[in-house]
């Protein structure tokens, strides 16, 4: 090896860099330095420039264009802005003009950008394994539907949740022509218990708007509203608005969490109580009785106090295994806050718990404040697992002429695969319309590729008075079609409707139902404005006054009293919850979302079973032991992770893993859906499960982003109570040490600007939206589970999570960690080729073509935030995946170090714009990817030299501190101490 370049540029760029001895390295060091200083570019980084022959008028080369659109996930929608360059989407952020999501976009909305360019997408129609055309598919669909209409034989149309008024109208039009059409809308992660309880109580299923920003006291009963909930971005924003304490008069909310399986919401609790999920309804009814007896809160008309007799606080506390004084303290908090309180229940709990929640919110008066029933949306009609089982039983008897499976994958998520197989084989003609050749597609004759949502048109009821619009940000990449467009074309040829395509159908429906009749504004102008803004206000009448059916409450009381009397046995409960990244499995082929650490366990690329310390000791289990989890005769395997804060007798397991198709998804985790009991009213909560270690003692490694959970007495995360905060000043903080460090190196000066960041740990909930936004913005590669296991992950931001206190019931502290852009940076002084330097405006910058990969900088970084490219990850990508790259950010080759840049490309874009317009940069105008994505508003970026900037003001807060100040490294990132608001005995007053 004579040429030092060969160390970095090998014949096989995807291979790992060979080890090199210290002697060999030193002999090549001078040559390496000469190479770095004498080369202006890397020969790996070459490309071909292909100009437009005729440039589209709306595209300005080098200038980003933004399109307002809408992301849907189950029953939830989020307004987004799609950033495009030269006609291709490269980044997604929240749309601040969207009335429902209010500028908040979730990590899965941002991460699904990668799904647009997924090389595993179905690229053209297939019929029985052979390529075909869309004309062939249309003829087959028309022939099938026409024959079914003549034979009066039903057709099964299976979809996901329909929250689009135009989609619903399209299906209704099809039903009018095909009276026997069976529309089965089903979501594998639907809030079945919540819908069932609402229907029983009010006579119709409603989805109320929850106003966490108005709540002084929030009680969560196994509800992960800050984590895996599809509406989490909005909830986080509202919750965090009451957590950031900027002045003494601010009133901080208090979060009580009662749960059995540890969640991100539980990690943010001010008070946390471990309760078995099956007993949560009894706890809620006990609180109702206590509020009525001790705090004079009236019961709703028709319900008598004696009906709550079985739920006296002492026996209920004893049966739950918790201290009665904690429940009294909780009741006192609720009694004090009254209408400024809010009780939430998780979708995994049975309907009885949801009915108890409605009772509590009614007694507290929350239904006139924090529970906005006037803005409630009717829940879409959704089938339960039991309903779907009945339909498949009919199909297995040959009762359907055809099956159309659109945006639904029952072959994967329906628990009884044998019944599904029997059903699908007895349906004469089957069509799968979807993104992938997934499990359901493999069982269907026709596999029809659908547009990704970024290629499609659509509309959605995001709120009772707001309709969102979706528009394509790019033309179809493959030979795909929007499912609605395919159906519209077939229906036109069958003389069912007259529109030529779905866009025409959509505009016609808006002309009839949304456009204000008699408006002086032409419809096309109205439509263009709605498309531009991403939606439109649509004034509608609020729901009729709701009357609670007390019989539903009484039934819940009877069932809960019976459960409460049963003693806690040695059998265990299993809580199934959607994966933080993969959700219900729809994103399982997405590398960004698979490599995103679970916010609680920090596991990636798998779904370990969370066990309590007590259960692990009882079963003689250790981390990574492989266990069998059985529910009756159904068994799955998963590795164990011993989770601090997990309630004894409760196991947590994420859904969405164990897929059978997709190059990324196959072999990742275990499919937990087969454990579900289709007949249960709470399918995601399983009683009486068995856990045992594999007989051969097999173990399975868990790729974890963090394996050390303790701060070991250090104070990198400072946490105070509200009471303690009142005694703090900026120069009098516990553990704060100021050192005047003498140095031979002159102190850096930044006469014009000094870019800095402030992170509010009190507002940050650890949702990881910043991690995905950074990965999307900065072309950060996916490394895979094997590399995560060896500590070679590439994400520039991580969320550190630490436990303190009793490991069986700890408190949790969270801290985003990224390059601190130190003024006296330890990484800069050890780089032999000057590849990492300081910019005139305070940025610790990387010059990639100088870097020769010594990794000295990484060794000398006290924050461990630098990442080294051990591989040439770009060469591993398949087309069209490389289209996701942001052209404003260099794609780094193998052998190069990288880290957070404070989004220098965004800084330069704003500087250039301000220079052209002849003005100064405004405070807040520059948003890094992480600060723009943070739904909590916990990250603030700006010019520290501007005394009026938010960054400068927050840096002077009595909560402000910088990490490792005693080293004299002068970080540019300031943290605001975490503030908690635990309940006190005075709350009883």
Regions found by a protein language model. Give the residues of each.
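Flexible glycine/proline-rich, aromatic-decorated loop/lid segments
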Residues: 264, 436-470, 793-794, 799, ...
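Hydrophobic alpha/beta core scaffold segments
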Residues: 398, 412-455, 614, 619
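Active-site phosphate/pyrophosphate-binding segments
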Residues: 271-395, 512-523, 527
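Short, well-ordered beta-strand core segments
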Residues: 218-219, 255, 272, 403, ...
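N-terminal export/assembly segments and adjacent metallocofactor-ligating motifs
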Residues: 1-310, 314-315, 321-328, 596-610, ...
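A short, gly/pro- and small-residue-rich
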Residues: 228-249, 415-431, 466-469
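Long, low-complexity segments enriched in small/aliphatic residues
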Residues: 348, 509-601
């Amino acid at each position: 090896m004579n040429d030092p370049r060969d160390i970095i540029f090998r014949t096989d760029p995807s291979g790992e860099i060979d080890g090199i001895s210290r002697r060999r390295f030193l002999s090549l060091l001078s040559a390496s330095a000469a190479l770095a200083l004498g080369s202006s570019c890397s020969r790996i980084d070459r490309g071909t420039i292909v100009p437009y022959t005729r440039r589209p008028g709306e595209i300005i080369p080098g200038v980003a264009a933004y399109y307002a659109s809408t992301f849907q996930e189950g029953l939830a929608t989020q307004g987004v802005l799609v950033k495009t360059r030269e006609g291709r989407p490269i980044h997604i952020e929240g749309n601040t003009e969207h009335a429902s999501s209010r500028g908040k976009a979730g990590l899965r909305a941002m991460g699904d950008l990668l799904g647009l360019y997924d090389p595993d997408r179905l690229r053209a129609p297939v019929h029985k394994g052979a390529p075909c055309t869309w004309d062939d598919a249309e003829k087959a669909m028309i022939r099938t539907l026409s024959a079914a209409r003549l034979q009066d034989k039903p057709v099964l149309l299976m979809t996901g949740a329909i929250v689009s008024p135009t989609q619903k109208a399209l299906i209704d039009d099809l039903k009018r022509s095909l009276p026997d059409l069976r529309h089965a809308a089903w979501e594998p992660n639907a809030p079945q218990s919540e819908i069932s309880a609402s229907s029983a109580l009010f006579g119709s299923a409603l989805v109320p708007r929850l106003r966490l920003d108005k709540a002084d006291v929030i009680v969560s009963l196994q509800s992960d509203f800050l984590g895996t909930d599809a509406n989490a971005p909005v909830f986080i924003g509202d919750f965090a608005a009451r957590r950031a304490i900027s002045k003494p008069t601010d009133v901080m909310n208090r979060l009580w969490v009662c749960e059995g399986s540890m969640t991100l919401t539980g990690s943010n609790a001010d008070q946390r109580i471990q309760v078995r999920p099956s007993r949560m309804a009894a706890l809620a009814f006990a609180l109702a009785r206590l509020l009525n007896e001790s705090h004079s809160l009236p019961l709703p008309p028709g319900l008598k106090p004696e009906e709550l007799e079985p739920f006296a606080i002492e026996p209920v506390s004893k049966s739950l295994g918790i201290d009665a004084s904690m429940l009294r303290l909780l009741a006192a908090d609720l009694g004090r806050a009254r209408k400024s309180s809010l009780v939430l229940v998780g979708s995994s709990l049975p309907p009885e718990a949801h009915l108890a929640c409605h009772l509590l919110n009614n007694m507290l008066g929350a239904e006139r404040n924090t529970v906005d029933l006037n803005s409630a949306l009717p829940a879409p009609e959704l089938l339960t697992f039991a309903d779907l089982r009945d339909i498949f039983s009919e199909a297995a008897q040959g009762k359907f002429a055809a099956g159309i499976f659109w945006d639904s994958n029952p072959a994967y998520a329906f628990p009884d695969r044998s019944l599904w197989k029997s059903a699908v084989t007895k349906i004469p003609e089957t069509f799968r319309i979807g993104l992938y050749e997934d499990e359901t597609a493999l069982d269907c004759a026709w596999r029809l590729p659908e547009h990704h949502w970024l290629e499609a048109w659509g509309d959605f009821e995001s709120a009772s008075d707001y309709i969102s619009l979706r528009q394509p940000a790019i033309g179809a990449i493959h030979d795909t079609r929007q499912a609605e467009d395919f159906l519209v074309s077939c229906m036109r040829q069958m003389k069912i409707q007259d529109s030529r395509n779905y866009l025409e159908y959509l505009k016609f429906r808006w002309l009839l139902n949304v456009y204000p009749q008699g408006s002086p504004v032409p419809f096309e102008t109205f439509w263009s404005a709605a498309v531009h803004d991403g939606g439109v206000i649509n004034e509608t009448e609020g729901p009729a006054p709701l009357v609670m059916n007390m019989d539903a409450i009484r039934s819940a009381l009877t069932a809960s009293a019976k459960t409460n009397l049963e003693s806690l046995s040695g059998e265990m409960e299993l809580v199934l919850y959607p994966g933080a990244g993969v959700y219900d499995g729809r994103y399982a082929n997405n590398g960004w979302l698979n490599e995103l650490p679970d916010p609680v366990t920090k596991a990636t690329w798998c779904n370990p079973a969370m066990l309590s310390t007590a259960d692990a000791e009882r079963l003689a289990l250790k981390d990574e032991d492989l266990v069998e989890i059985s529910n009756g005769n159904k068994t799955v395997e998963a590795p164990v992770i011993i989770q601090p804060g997990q309630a004894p007798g409760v196991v947590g397991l994420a859904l969405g893993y164990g897929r059978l198709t997709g190059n990324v998804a196959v072999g990742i985790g275990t499919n937990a859906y087969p454990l579900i009991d289709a007949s249960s009213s709470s399918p995601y909560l399983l009683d009486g499960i068995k856990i045992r270690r594999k007989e051969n003692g097999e173990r399975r490694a868990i790729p974890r982003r963090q394996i050390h959970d303790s701060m070991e007495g250090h104070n990198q995360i400072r946490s105070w109570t509200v009471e303690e905060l009142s005694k703090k000043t900026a120069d009098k903080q516990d553990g704060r040490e100021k050192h005047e460090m003498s140095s031979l190196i002159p102190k850096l000066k930044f006469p014009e600007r000094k870019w800095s960041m402030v992170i509010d740990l009190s507002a940050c909930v650890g949702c990881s939206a910043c991690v995905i936004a950074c990965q999307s913005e900065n072309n950060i590669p996916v490394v895979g589970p094997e590399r995560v296991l060896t500590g070679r992950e590439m994400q520039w931001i991580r969320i550190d999570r630490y436990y303190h206190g009793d490991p069986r019931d700890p408190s949790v502290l969270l801290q985003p960690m990224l390059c601190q852009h130190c003024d006296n940076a330890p990484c800069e002084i050890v780089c032999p080729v000057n590849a990492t330097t300081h910019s005139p405006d305070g940025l610790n910058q990387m010059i990639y073509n100088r870097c020769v990969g010594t990794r000295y900088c990484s060794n000398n970084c006290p924050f461990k935030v630098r990442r080294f490219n051990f591989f040439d990850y770009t060469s591993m990508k398949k087309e069209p995946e490389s289209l996701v790259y942001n052209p404003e950010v260099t794609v780094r080759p193998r052998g190069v170090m990288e880290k957070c840049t404070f989004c220098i490309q965004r800084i330069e874009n704003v500087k250039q714009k301000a220079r052209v317009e002849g003005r100064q940069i405004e405070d807040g105008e520059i948003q890094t990817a992480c600060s723009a994505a943070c739904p909590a508003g916990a990250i603030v970026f700006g010019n520290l030299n501007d005394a009026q900037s938010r960054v400068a003001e927050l840096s002077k807060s009595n909560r402000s501190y910088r990490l490792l100040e005693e080293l004299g490294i002068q970080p540019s990132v300031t943290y605001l101490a975490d503030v908690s608001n635990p309940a006190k005995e005075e709350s009883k007053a």
